[in-house]
Structure formats: C-alpha cells, structure tokens
From Swiss-Prot:
This is Bifunctional protein FolD. The lineage of its organism: Bacteria, Bacillati, Bacillota, Clostridia, Eubacteriales. GO terms for biological process: L-histidine biosynthetic process; methionine biosynthetic process; purine nucleotide biosynthetic process; tetrahydrofolate interconversion. Pathway: One-carbon metabolism; tetrahydrofolate interconversion. Keywords: Amino-acid biosynthesis, Histidine biosynthesis, Hydrolase, Methionine biosynthesis, Multifunctional enzyme, NADP, One-carbon metabolism, Oxidoreductase, Purine biosynthesis. It catalyses: (6R)-5,10-methylene-5,6,7,8-tetrahydrofolate + NADP(+) = (6R)-5,10-methenyltetrahydrofolate + NADPH; (6R)-5,10-methenyltetrahydrofolate + H2O = (6R)-10-formyltetrahydrofolate + H(+).
C-alpha cells in the first residue's frame, strides 16, 4: 500500500516560517505584509476562497484587505481599484479572484496588476519570467506540487514526469517548474494517444484535468508518486481527479483530496506576499 502525502503537515512548516517572519518584524516595529483581495460579483467559489485566504492570513499575523465590487460595475471600475492598490505602499500583494463575471475583460484587467505585487503570478510579465526560468513569484498551486514532491526528499533531476492537463493555471506552469528542476517532462491532454501507457511509465504523475476519479490503478506503476491537483464535487463530496481508494494500493505515494495540494496553496500565496514586502524594501 502506498503512503499518503499530507499537505497539511507540509503547510504547517511553511506557516511556522511565516509566523516567525511576521513576529520578527513586529518586534522591530517594522511593517508587516498586507494583502488586498478583489472580488467582483458574488461567485460562491470565489467568496469561499477569499474567506479562506483571509482566515489563514489573519492566523499568521498578515493583514488582509477585502474589496468587493458589484457585478454591475465595469472594467474601468476594477482597473481604477487595482491602480490605487498599485500605488499604495502599504499593500504588498494583490489577489484578483477569478473567474470574473462574463461581462468583464479578464486579460485586460489582469494586465493592470503591478508585477511587483502579482503574488498569484497572473500577469503576462510574471508568466513570462516563469518560462524564462527567472520567476519573481512562484504560482501557488504549481509551487504546492513541487513543494510536496520535495517534502519526500526525492531527487527530481532526470525523473520521468507526466503532467496530465495543460491549463495556464496549473498544467503549463507546473511543467515549467519541473523543467527548471531538470526533470524530463511530458504534458498530456485530451488528444494524447495511448494515455494510459504514457501515465503508467511515469516516475511522477501530476493530474490536473478536473475530471473526478478519472485516474484509476491501471494508470500508475507501483513506484509512482501521484500528485492530485483536481477538486470537483462528486456525489456530494469534494473529490480529486484520482480514484484514491483504487490508486493508493498501487502507487508509492499519493496526495489526498482534500488534505493535499490545496492545503498548501493559500499558505504559499501568503509567503509570496512576505517576499514581496522584503523586495520592496530594497
């Protein structure tokens, strides 16, 4: 039987680092990190995530400002708020809750976020630096994947890694981070032929396709490390892209959902805000 990778335990270690950083600054009467989060409309998922981000930030001593705009506003209203935050030296990180309502130009609005405060790595400049191997901030979900793999003290160099999914939020950036670690990376998607065989040859399998319980035991080998990034509602429960009960008996390591990648993502977002504060001081 495989071992479970506990994302909550890894997150606790990072949280301790953040707490120490914030407490040290408070003792020296220095500024503490402050994050601004913008919500447009009333999407239930975005409201939940913003609340979760605020809760974690407050528990670590990081200030968190919530800005809520009605769906009846327009692109320029959102951009005006972003520009204010860009100019505010007391704000170190800006989060734009996505997706925006359909009547907004998401790309146009994202472009307005200062790269120095883009702790979610959304802007073209941030993503360009990532693909050039010189990221200012690491995108949080892909960084969670890498952090969990490294927590196993396993050398990624030369490993055969299969990334299932090619989204701009997870698939592509996690593949780039793995390339930066000198892994041999294959990206698979809905048009990939012989998908089961490709996945089965992976030393590390990262699954991010948004299809609950898609990966079963026939997709993995007994030495595989399987990282499940998916989160879907399935039969009234939050479920990953991997059929946990079937795969845990076949692979070497597996992240659960919930309790895996998602447990670490918000913590790493807040860590990015700490790094932004430090950079702005120099």
């Amino acid at each position: 039987m495989g071992q479970i990778i506990n994302g909550k335990e890894v997150a606790l270690k990072v949280k301790e680092e953040i707490k120490n950083f914030v407490n040290n600054r408070k003792e020296k009467n220095l500024q503490v990190p402050k994050i601004a989060s913008i919500l447009v409309g009333n999407d239930g998922g975005s409201i939940y995530y913003m609340g979760s981000q605020e809760k974690v930030a407050n528990s670590l001593g990081v200030e968190f400002l919530k800005l809520t705009l009605p769906e009846t506003c327009n692109d320029e209203d959102v951009i005006a708020e972003i520009n204010k935050l860009n100019e505010d030296n007391n704000i170190h990180g800006i989060i734009l809750q996505l997706p925006l309502p359909n009547n907004f130009d998401e790309k146009k609005i994202i472009k307005q976020i200062s790269p120095n405060k883009d702790i979610d790595c959304l802007t073209f400049e941030s993503q360009g630096k990532l693909y050039m191997g010189e990221p200012k901030f690491l995108p949080c979900t892909p960084n969670s994947v890498i952090t969990l793999i490294k927590s196993l003290n396993i050398d990624i160099v030369g490993k055969n890694v299969v990334v299932l999914g090619r989204s701009n939020i997870v698939g592509k950036p996690v593949a780039q981070l793995l390339l930066n670690e000198n892994a041999t990376v294959t990206i698979c998607h809905s048009k990939t032929k012989n998908l089961r065989e490709v996945c089965k040859n992976a030393d590390i399998l990262v699954v991010a396709i948004g299809r609950p319980k898609f990966i079963d035991e026939t997709y993995v080998n007994e030495n595989a490390i399987v990282i499940d990034v998916g989160t879907s509602s399935f039969e009234g429960k939050i479920t990953g892209d991997v059929d946990f009960d079937k795969v845990i008996d076949k692979c070497r390591y597996l992240t659960p959902v919930p309790g895996g990648v998602g447990s670490l993502t918000t913590t790493l977002l807040i860590k990015n805000a700490c790094e932004a504060l430090q950079e702005n001081e120099y």
